[in-house]
Amino acid sequence: MCIRDRLEIYSLYDLIYYFPYKYVDRSRIYYIHEIDGNMPYIQLKGEILGFETIGEGRQRRLTAHFSDGTGIVDLVWFQGIKYILGKYKLHEEYIIFGKPTVFNGRINVAHPDIDKPDDLKLSSVGLQPYYNTTEKMKRSFLNSHAIEKMMATVIQQIQEPLPETLSPKILSDHHLMPLTEALRNIHFPTNPDSLRRAQYRLKFEELFYVQLNILRYAKDRQRRYRGYIFERVGDVFNTFYSQNLPFQLTGAQKRVLKEIRNDVGSGRQMNRLLQGDVGSGKTLVALMSMLLALDNGFQACMMAPTEILANQHYETIKELLFGMDIRVELLTGSIKGKKREAILTGLLTGDVKILIGTHAVIEDTVNFSSLGLVVIDEQHRFGVAQRARLWTKNIQPPHVLVMTATPIPRTLAMTLYGDLDVSVIDELPPGRKPITTIHQFDNRRESMYRAVRKQIEEGRQVYIVYPLIKESEKIDLKNLEEGYQHILEEFPGCTVAKVHGKMKSAEKDEQMQLFISGQAQIMVATTVIEVGVNVPNASVMIIENAERFGLSQLHQLRGRVGRGAEQSYCILVTNYKLTEDTRKRLEIMVRTNDGFEIAEADLKLRGPGDLEGTQQSGIAFDLKIANLARDGQLLQYVRSIAEDIVDNDPSAQSPENKILWRQLKSLRKTNVNWAAIS
């Protein structure tokens, strides 16, 4: 077992930047007569009086009776028994550290850290660092304690100060600890204040370079790429506004539309992120932006991640443009032959004004006459390279409007999309009622079904979402196939549609149409219906095993209902065995419908690396010490410093700033330039 195989540590640099995830105070040695099984950790000095092996095979365990003269505790190992017996001797002095428990009336410490007093030196004194490891590493005795000892050896070898990665001015102006001192103290802090200062220095540097990278690229893009100028609001836009607009725009929609008009009329390329909760009217704003492109002689394109969503956008936009002489086409992987050829020809001649599609629109055979605006819906579901290909369909890049119904916390948006201008639609169209969310345990299913029957009798429709398609031997969860049969039996007079990710597209679309048209009263599905499906008549969303879903996913699923004028309900069904984090998630869902509040809570509970879509960014997983949920203020602070540098010295003429650009260049070798393309 090698450390590089499990933790991607290939050099001393990687090792020294592998930071502890927590620290435990080891400044005190207890006497055995002082301790009890409720203490979080204990540290004892004493000797092993004897060893005892109990059980056979997998049940085998080794117990060492350890004493300091005031009492006896049992040290217990379930693995590595031969190694332990060979390494530790009877009646020699050791310091042991671990978590106490009580078993058969005696204090036990399972798999403790054990050191000879003379071996402690840098490690295991004061605040002890703890490093993340895997179970396989622990079985090979490459545990946190082993990494700590390796780290102590490396730190002791640093005789000369390491080259600085921040300029003297930044270090001085912001009272930052020198790099070498910070690295020593992050691994082996001399006291809590030294640890705090080391963490601050390293977080500052990490977030500073993230922002410097984003802002420098944004500045460079503005310099290199001019945008098409949409000078006029013409007949197309005005006709739609006066004759086809389905309802009055909300104040938020008007504000966002004004921001977009300012962008496309400015002469610089628009690169804007449009956030809006489910049902907030983003598609209407996107359509009106596309009509501005048409008024100025350009084409527009909208790309969606799935055929279902692309079809839905196509039908919605065709309906909104009814009676207007605008050719709108749909291009997906399933459209072939003469129909496809006609669409491609229409794009080249300019007859096709608006193209809506999936990733099929980025294929090499798809070329436009004059593409002026690209709208990317649910963009986190596309890879960076896919988005880039659409962005480069013209010699001069088109304006880009990125839409998401997955609200992104402000700190995360600054990190992932810091080079984009951000617009937020933060109000729902008039007449929408807040969705009532209920947490219900599995054993109250009959009362839930009675409520569902009442909704169906009143003409409403119901979604039921399952975490699995088929039964699993590994986990005991509700699954769609069994659920489908159960629902058929429970609701004999109803038509039940079924959709999951392993169905062929044609079959999936057929089942979706059954539900969309109202022929099916109930749809059982997996999370394939999470994004974009719009059935205003659906008023109930039941999520089975809701404890298996993250906050963001629960919120997206809930957003499939509440799209009509009637009261809607979301029922979160779970068993009784829930973790504390799960209880918190469910309480948040019951308490609020606000997607941004939910996104902030999700960031705090899960961290940025786990949030849906951040994996595409190439940055969430690269943060070694900063935490976007906790370090939002620091992020804003370093962003202002980076902005000042980029604005005043964009070409790094100042000797002070050369070190910054040099360090940024070395960091960027390992990072994708995701900032370029939303």
List each language-model region with its residue ranges.
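Conserved pre-motif I regulatory segment
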Residues: 228-274
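Upstream accessory/linker segments immediately N-terminal to the RecA-like ATPase cores of bacterial MutS
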Residues: 54-244
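OB-fold nucleic-acid-binding modules
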Residues: 18-45
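Conserved small/polar residues in nucleotide/adenosyl-binding loops
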Residues: 1-6
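Short, surface-exposed secondary-structure boundary micro-motifs
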Residues: 47, 99-100, 213, 546, ...
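Inter-lobe coupling/hinge segments of SF2-like helicase ATPases
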Residues: 255-258, 269-587
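Accessory helical-bundle/CTD segments and flexible terminal tails appended to RecA-like ATPase motors
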Residues: 512-522, 529-536, 541-544, 559, ...
